[in-house]
Amino acid sequence: MENIENGILTLLFENNEVKIRTINSEPYFDLENVCEILEIENPRRAKERLDEQGVYFLFDYWSSKSQRKDFISESNLYKLILQSHRLENIKFAVWITSEVSPIFIRNKVAKKIIKDLEELRTKDLEELRRTQKS
């Protein structure tokens, strides 16, 4: 299942929600969701072991109670997976690399193609204007 609401993509991994937010064109994962899937009991303590630069927070204004939500970078996600020492979590890592990451890679490629086409169109229009003036 795929759902985008308030700029957050929600996917399902084995009936568990994984909320993903794009920050600076990179995927960031809801720390609480990740900890639940990896069976990490204390997300706050898990966050302390992560690279601070790969942790962003947002305030969840759209739910009934406004709360702070932490989102972690893909590298921090893998750090948590590797630190968990649970063989079952390999399935989650495989799902991320085979199903989730390609979504963002395709999105980056599409944005680059669109940008290149817009630049090409601008150059063509400029060239057309120059030839019409001559």
Where do the model's predicted regions map?
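Periodic self-assembly scaffolds
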Residues: 115-134
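An anion-engaging/catalytic patch
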Residues: 1-119
